[in-house]
Regions:
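Catalytic-loop of the protein kinase fold
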Residues: 48-50, 55
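Active-site activation/catalytic loop segments of kinase-like enzymes and analogous catalytic loops
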Residues: 83-131, 144-162
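Activation of the activation-loop gatekeeper triad in protein kinase-fold domains
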Residues: 71-76
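Hydrophobic residue at the +6 position relative to the catalytic HRD Asp in the kinase catalytic loop
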Residues: 58-60
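Short, small-residue-biased leader/transition segments that mark boundaries at the very start
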Residues: 2-3
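Protein kinase catalytic-loop region centered on the HRD/HxD motif
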Residues: 40-47
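Regulatory N- and C-terminal appendages and interdomain linkers associated
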Residues: 27, 151-194
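Catalytic cores of eukaryotic secretory-pathway lumenal/extracellular enzymes that build
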Residues: 11-19
Length: 194
């Protein structure tokens, strides 16, 4: 029950942040805020999570497929390790963009030619390294992480609007909120079909 409450608390937190900074109505965000509390999987146990675990926060060994260091730990907290893993896996399914969240996207690239594993293999490698026989369905976690990222970007846009922050990329961030919400809703619908 504690794990379920934490998932609901996270959705409630990001929903409140989003609503406080909203500059327009985005139906997919409203759908996600209604759908997520009842559809996030029960947490797979608490552990230290990075909070911003993505490829550009990793230093990789130049001569072998090995992580040498993980950078930027300021968002670290206790949480669901699968949610942290799936945030990392978003690079494989994130719509490509020249600015902001999509700049690190691997979508449409030949990841194996880049020396990276396919998403399915990467997730399986994680499960094996973590001593897990399998992973829960990833689609609800993808829906949550796209929702969370959209809420974070909208929060920045809202602070710029309110004059409490400045960001030269605020327009580009604002332009990404809707596509991220659409991607989140896409994954929620995929979860319903699974």
């Amino acid at each position: 029950e504690m794990c379920i409450r934490d998932s609901q608390r996270q959705v409630r937190r990001w929903s409140e942040n989003y609503r406080l900074s909203a500059t327009e109505t985005i139906d997919d965000m409203d759908r996600l805020m209604a759908w997520l509390p009842d559809h996030l999987p029960t947490s797979q146990g608490a552990s230290i999570v990075h909070g911003d675990y993505r490829l550009d926060n990793l230093i990789l060994a130049p001569d072998q497929p090995q992580i040498r260091a993980v950078l930027d730990w300021e968002l670290a907290t206790l949480g669901d390790p699968i949610a942290d893993l799936v945030y990392h896996l978003m690079a494989w399914v994130m719509p490509r963009s020249d600015t902001g969240a999509g700049t690190g996207s691997l979508m449409g690239l030949d990841v194996e030619a880049l020396g990276l594993p396919r998403l399915e293999d990467h997730a399986a490698d994680y499960a094996q390294a973590a001593g897990r026989s399998n992973l829960p369905p990833l689609e609800p976690y993808l829906a949550y992480n796209f929702f969370r990222l959209a809420a974070i970007l909208q929060g920045i846009v809202g602070r710029v609007r309110d004059g409490t922050a400045s960001n030269d990329n605020a327009k580009a961030m604002a332009d990404q909120v809707r596509p991220l919400a659409q991607a989140g809703w896409h994954w929620a619908q995929q979860a319903e079909r699974s």
